[in-house]
Amino acid sequence: MALRTVGFCLAVLLSLVARSASAQHLWWDADGKKDATAVYGQITVYATNPGTYYCGINWHPGEPAGGYCGIQHNEPARKCTIFSIWDTSKDLHPAVTAADAKTKHNRFGGEGEGGHTHMDWNWNLGETFEFYAVKTPAAAGDFTDVKYYAFERTAKKWIHEATIQTPNGGHKSVANFSGGAMASFLENWTGKDKDVARLATYRLWIGDGPTTLKPLVKSGGDGTWGELNDCYFLAAGGDDALKAVYEKWEKDLGKPVFGGKGKKLPPITAKPVDADVVKALQDLPAAGKVE
C-alpha cells in the first residue's frame, strides 16, 4: 500500500528539556521499571485552543533512543494524533514500514531529526483519548519495530496508525520505553493566545505487553501541574481563564491539587487497566505495509 508523504502536521517538536515557558511537563517515576516495552496511556482535554499539543508520553530511555505520541489541536476545525521517533544517529534513520490508509508521514527537523506520522483525529473535550505503543524486535536484525495504536471511540475499535522501524545501532535503549526520562507535556507551540485556558489530565501504564501493564502513580512537574480527578494534570493560560475552567468542571472532576517546583504530591490511585482494554490489546489490527 502506497502512503502519501505530506507536509508536517505543524507541531513544534520538543526535546525532553523544556525550551520555553509555553510548555509544561509531567516527569513520571517508572518505579524502577527500566525495560518496559509497552505503554498504554490516557489523555483527557477539558479546555483547548488551536496551536496546542498534548503529549501523552515523550520517552528517552538513554542515548540515542527517543520518541513521543499524543494529540494536537491544529486549527479551529482540525485535530490529529501524532507519533514520531528520533534518529538513532545522523546515519541511522527510522522508517515507516506499516500504516493506516489515512496516516501521513514525513521526516522532521528542527529540534533533532527523525520520522514523523500523524492522522486526523477529531477528539472532543471531556472525552478520554486512549493510545497504546509497543516495541518488538524486528525481523530485519538490529532493528526495533515501534507500533502505535489509537482507540476510535465512535467505532469502538483500535486503529493501527503506524509502525516505525528504528535501527538499534547496537544500543539496547532503543528497544525500551523506560530506563531514563519519561514525560508528558502540554505545549502552546504557536506562542499565541497565552491567556486562553488549556487543561488536560494524563495517566500512563507500562509493562512488557497488555497483561503486564502497571500504572505509574508518581510524577513531578513544571509549569502549572498537579492532581485532578485522580490523574495528573497540566494547564496553561491566564489566571481568570483557568479559574473559570476549574469551576466549570468541578462538579465532575473535583478541585485541583496544585504541585509546584520541588513539591511532592501523594501518589494517585494505582488503577489497573480495564479488563476489556487488556483483552482488546491482545488482538490488535495490523495496518498495511508501506512500500
Task: Give the ranges of each region predicted by the language model.
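N-terminal secretory signal peptides that target proteins for export/translocation
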Residues: 1-3
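Short, aromatic/His-centered strand-loop micro-motif at the edge of beta-sheets
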Residues: 106-130
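Secretory/extracellular carbohydrate-interaction modules
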Residues: 23-105, 118, 255, 259-264, ...
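Carbohydrate-binding surfaces in secreted/extracellular proteins
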Residues: 123-160
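Bacterial N-terminal signal peptides
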Residues: 7-17
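Extended effector regions of multi-domain proteins
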Residues: 211-291
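Flexible glycan-contacting loops in extracellular carbohydrate-active proteins
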Residues: 166-194
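Local beta-strand/beta-hairpin segments that build beta-sheet-rich folds
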Residues: 155-169, 216
